[in-house]
Amino acid sequence: MLVVLSPAKTLDVETPAPVTAFSQADLLDDSQLLINRCNQLSMQDIASLMKVSDKIAGLNVARFSQWHRPFVLNNAKQALFAFQGDVYTGLQAESLSLEAINYAQMHLRILSGLYGLLRPLDLMQAYRLEMGTKLENVRGANLYQFWGSLITQRLNKALAAQGDNLLINLASNEYFKAVKIKELNGLIITPVFKDQKNGQYKVISFYAKKARGLMTRYIIEQQVTALDKLKEFDSAGYYFVESASSATELVFYRDEM
């Protein structure tokens, strides 16, 4: 079972990670091409391209210009501990056991606009470059064209290494679009989390993101390998609903408090 997550815009690259073990991302040469392209952009270009304030654009101009290899522990941080958004609030990586972290290194991948695909212990430097950004580059008009089949090839390699063909898609649509489904040697299972509001069950973004993190933690702590075990997920009051699910979409409800 291989889990795929989105990254987060919120980062903490200052606080030391709870482990010193690290790995290097597979696609850093490709990342360097994107950094070279981003370093050609002005603050105004970035503000317009990313639809952000001048302050955030300025921060990212600085990040792009300061990005440099080699990555070591005093200039970079392991991806699992660097990302801090809603998904990662649910995951709470800092409190994972060493056994769970080692399991995650084999069974978890994080999609990234800049890095393509990250393992949990891959070092990264701070950045903001969302997968949906329409950044013209040496390979096309956007990041989907830039990454092409590279991400899917790495996912196939990870699926082959970890022993079965189940890929659990806990990423957002924006990021999972970077995966070429027809080229993937796996069965994609997409969990969906719906909260009850005014008597109806629907996806509420903030809660759904946190639930993706909770499920990721459940998978790597319990070392889940079978779908039946995945259906037993019940963190934070969620429960599996067979009648709302399909062969490739597992739906979990949570009742209104």
Swiss-Prot record:
GO biological process: one example: response to hydroperoxide
Pfam hit, one: H2O2_YaaD
Protein name as it appears in the record: UPF0246 protein Ping_3037
Taxonomic source organism: Psychromonas ingrahamii (strain DSM 17664 / CCUG 51855 / 37)
Classification via InterPro entries: YaaA (IPR005583)
Gene Ontology CC: cytosol
Family of the protein in this entry: Belongs to the UPF0246 family.
